[in-house]
Regions:
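Peripheral, non-transmembrane regulatory/ligand-interaction domains of membrane transport proteins
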Residues: 2-296, 349, 379-380
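Hydrophobic alpha-helical transmembrane segments and their immediately adjacent juxtamembrane loops
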Residues: 3-19, 285-380
């Protein structure tokens, strides 16, 4: 058991270990993790395994973090522990075992952190935001286009700990892929950190492509001519605002991660294998491209929103012109009938034989002339 120096871990030692009811979690072999686990193991642990020479060490039963670390100290290798939304008391057990810094522990438990990289004496603390695109057939009136989660990583010389928050960003498939690549896994905890960074950024790329399709669709609708080649009436601005809100959330995940990826790819670090560090450059390059896309999305949506509002304004002006044109046409018969509705005694045309049809013909002729003139000028 590792004991951190005072006063760094004083607040951690005061936390009481509280165990939540066991939550089933399947291992790769299909067995339920929680059925045979030591009752003292925190229930937030999704998986706990020791890896030696790129292979998972199988001792015939699930390991507790303490047992896993004891195996590593005795026989070598490293331990990888995955947790999902642990409480302070649950994570205190892990923090004491691995000597994690209290500030990093606090961030890992509380969540809602910006993507970042923090270096401590014996570990690196990295925060990633995961992004998941919600398909349109799954959207509701109050749902979001993208959903976010968090993955926090503690990288040490002989341990790697992941703390996941939110329903997205499961690392089970990634762990299985790494177990199928012993050569890479043999590189140790830094190889796992790179794989998670690459996995998260690949998710950004996929979401960026999907959001691009949504923006293209909205842009097409905004600039599609209206009926009979008329002015487009635009689209519901709420949809554009929804996309802008989701792009902003996307930007909050991507932009702060640029600096950590740059540090991991360029600055030598004691806990990062130099050979693995080269691969962080590829991740940083992909992240930079996604960041450029997200910035472009924001600017494009601003332009689309302005164009949509302009289209709506033009359409309203067109409606007002039509209303005005018809009002001008209707004014003629209104005026004529108004004149002959007055009760004057001397109105000579009232006694003319063809006075009535003449007035009707005059009214219709004037209305037709006005209609033709307005139509020629584009008011109708």
């Amino acid at each position: 058991l590792l004991v951190a120096k005072e006063p760094a871990m004083s607040m951690i030692r005061d936390l009481r270990a509280v165990v939540r009811p066991s939550r089933p979690s399947l291992r790769k072999d299909g067995g339920a993790y929680d059925t045979t686990r030591d009752p003292g193991t925190p229930s937030a642990v999704v998986d706990c395994a020791v890896y030696r020479d790129g292979a998972r060490v199988d001792i015939g039963k699930p390991l507790t973090p303490h047992e896993a670390m004891r195996l590593v100290r005795r026989d070598g290798g490293f331990v990888w522990i995955g947790l999902h939304e642990p409480t302070e008391a649950e994570f205190a057990v892990i923090a004491r075992e691995f000597g994690l810094h209290p500030l990093a522990v606090e961030d890992a438990v509380q969540a809602h952190q910006r993507p970042k990289l923090e270096r401590y004496d014996d570990s690196l603390f990295t925060v990633f935001k995961t992004i998941h695109y919600v398909e349109h057939d799954q959207l509701t009136a109050n749902s979001e286009v993208v959903e976010t989660g968090e993955v926090m990583c503690f990288t040490g010389r002989d341990f790697f700990i992941t703390v996941r928050h939110g329903g997205q960003g499961s690392l089970r498939a990634l762990r299985h892929r790494l177990q199928d690549d012993p050569e890479l896994l043999a590189r140790g905890p830094s190889a796992v950190l790179h794989s998670i960074a690459d996995h998260v950024v690949d998710g950004y790329v996929a979401v960026a492509d999907a959001v691009q399709d949504d923006i293209d669709e909205v842009e097409t609708e905004v600039f599609t001519p209206g009926r009979k080649g008329g002015v487009s009436r635009g689209v519901d601005s709420a949809r554009i605002y929804q996309l802008k809100r989701e792009v902003l959330e996307f930007k909050r995940a991507v932009s702060p991660l640029l600096r950590p990826m740059q540090l991991l790819s360029e600055r030598p670090m004691r806990l990062i294998d130099p050979d693995i560090q080269k691969y962080f450059r590829d991740v940083a390059d992909h992240l930079a491209r996604v960041h450029e896309q997200v910035i472009g999305f924001d600017e494009l949506l601003n332009s689309i929103l302005q164009a949509n509002l302009a289209q709506a304004s033009v359409a309203q002006n067109e409606d007002m012109r039509k209303i005005t044109a018809w009002a001008a046409i209707i004014a003629v018969p209104t005026m004529v009938t108004g004149v002959y509705g007055m009760n004057f005694e001397h109105m000579p045309e009232l006694h003319a034989k063809y006075g009535y049809p003449a007035v009707l013909a005059f009214t219709v002729t004037v209305c037709l002339a006005i209609h033709r003139t307005l139509k020629r000028n584009g008011w109708l």
